[in-house]
């Protein structure tokens, strides 16, 4: 049985060590990138990343242009600082932690007494850099929550087409990205009618795109929530990460961390969301309220997988949680109302 990490991961680790030394000599400085987390009365999941970034400051005009016309490639500036030491401060409690080989911090810490609601935690790097992350503490009495995909569910990317995926990720300005109609309004209505319920985004997108996604959500009125994204590059078992496995693991962790909640799973029919959600509903029936699938347009569907199964006669569905489909948020909201399983 092989115990050594995959060759690609070992090669990447060696290259990172060399590049880290070079970048430090060139004046690059440590930076902490915080991500939104979640927690309960017992534990808090804190997410962040330690990276090296150029220390050069832009002029006023350049900074304004960068702010107003951010392009995707700007989200990828920075180089991970592997195994970096850090600490997390929650109230009067400070906990030492260490980043993984990708510079990521993903830890669960005992809740020192934070009440349900939104709170701030501070992540401090070993070289003095720090950042504040938001965490939502979810009350023990909360029984409803929403899990949402991002690409082609709230944000139109035409992601499965390789050229457009690269264009959207690295070139397209953030202001040019399109929101799926009605999704923000639907999410707002559900969370307003069910105060304290979490909205958690689970996506195969890279954590590098987190700042862009947050700005997009704010601009289009999409409620704030934890984002469980992934990383690009080799793993300890292969050259590429499995997006399907990432989502499957994220759903299992949510069921474990928030056992009282039954989830409305929201995704699209462009890739694997219907199958993943059906599998989760079958294996964890106590944790799934319903499954909402946004139907891609014919053009999007062809780019996603070439064909589209229009009728449900041959589509398998678990009987434990209803599934409904519509092309936008307003249509999905109407169908959920007809099911009469939650109020909003």
What are these regions (language model features)?
Residues 53, 157, 188, 256, ...:
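Residue-level marker of positions within ordered structural domains that often coincide
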Residues 1-134, 138, 329-344:
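Intrinsically disordered, serine/threonine/proline
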Residues 2-31, 37-40, 47, 82, ...:
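Alpha-helical substrate-recognition element adjacent to the catalytic core
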Residues 71-75, 113, 159-161, 170-173, ...:
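Glycine-rich loops and low-complexity Gly/Arg-rich segments
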Residues 1-6, 21, 205-344:
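C-terminal cap/substrate-recognition subdomain and adjoining C-terminal extension
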């Amino acid at each position: 049985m092989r115990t050594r990490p995959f060759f690609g991961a070992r090669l990447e680790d060696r290259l990172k060590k060399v590049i880290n030394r070079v970048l430090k000599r060139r004046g690059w400085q440590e930076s902490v990138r915080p991500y939104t987390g979640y927690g309960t009365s017992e534990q808090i999941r804190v997410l962040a990343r330690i990276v090296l970034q150029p220390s050069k400051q832009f002029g006023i005009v350049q900074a304004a242009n960068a702010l107003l016309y951010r392009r995707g490639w700007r989200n990828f500036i920075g180089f991970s600082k592997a195994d970096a030491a850090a600490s997390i401060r929650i109230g009067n409690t400070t906990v030492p932690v260490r980043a993984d080989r990708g510079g990521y911090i993903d830890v669960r810490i005992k809740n020192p007494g934070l009440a349900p609601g939104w709170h701030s935690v501070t992540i401090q790097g070993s070289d003095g850099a720090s950042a504040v992350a938001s965490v939502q503490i979810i009350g023990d009495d909360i029984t409803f929550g929403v899990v949402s995909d991002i690409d082609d569910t709230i944000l139109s990317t035409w992601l499965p087409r390789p050229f457009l995926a690269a264009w959207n990720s690295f070139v397209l300005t953030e202001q040019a990205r399109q929101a799926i109609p009605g999704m923000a309004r639907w999410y707002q209505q559900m969370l307003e009618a069910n105060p304290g319920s979490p909205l958690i985004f689970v996506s195969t997108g890279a954590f590098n795109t987190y700042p862009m996604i947050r700005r997009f959500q704010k601009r289009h009125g999409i409620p704030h929530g934890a984002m469980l994204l992934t990383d690009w590059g080799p793993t300890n078992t292969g050259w590429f990460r499995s997006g399907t496995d990432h989502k499957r693991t994220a759903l299992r962790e949510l069921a474990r961390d928030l056992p009282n909640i039954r989830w409305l799973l929201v995704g699209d029919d462009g890739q694997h969301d219907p199958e993943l959600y059906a599998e989760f509903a079958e294996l964890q029936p106590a944790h799934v309220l319903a499954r909402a699938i946004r139907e891609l347009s014919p053009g999007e569907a062809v780019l996603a997988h070439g064909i589209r199964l229009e009728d449900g006669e041959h589509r398998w569905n678990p009987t434990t949680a209803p599934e409904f489909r519509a092309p936008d948020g307003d249509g999905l909201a109407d169908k959920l109302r007809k099911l009469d399983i939650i109020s909003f």
